[in-house]
Amino acid sequence: AQRFAIENRALMAESIINKTGWKVISSFDSIHNYIDLEARILRKGATDASQGKYLVIPLNMRDGAIIAIGKGNEDWNCSAPHGAGRVMSRTKAKENVSLAEFKNTMQGIYSSSVVESTLDESPFAYKKSGEIISRIQDTVKIEKIIKPVYNFKAKN
């Protein structure tokens, strides 16, 4: 299953690159929720942050994602969080986040996906970016934070 997932991501990326005509400068794979057979680690809610390994830590629809390099910290099992983590369940987010709040916080980011059916994916449903950034310094070196220009979420 893990090999299939790797190949599937590569094919999706290849399709997008071919259709857009973009030039690939560099690339890396950053997977989460998997069994690292080589290190004998089950990474649930985590991604590989081995020494020198590039990884992505998604924040939310508004704030983007962290591009980082692993420090290989054994105290963290050479791992890092695979995302910001929820502060609200999908149900709670749909009950507590208004569409007006969601639209307001997403100003400046083009998206046709800021709608009622994606309230559970709003930035309010996730931990604040600053909280994540301040807590991962022992396991990764942050290279950059990429900000979304366009954000798309599938609806139902």
Kindly give the residue locations of the regions a language model identified:
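Domain-length cofactor-binding catalytic modules of enzymes
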Residues: 1-156
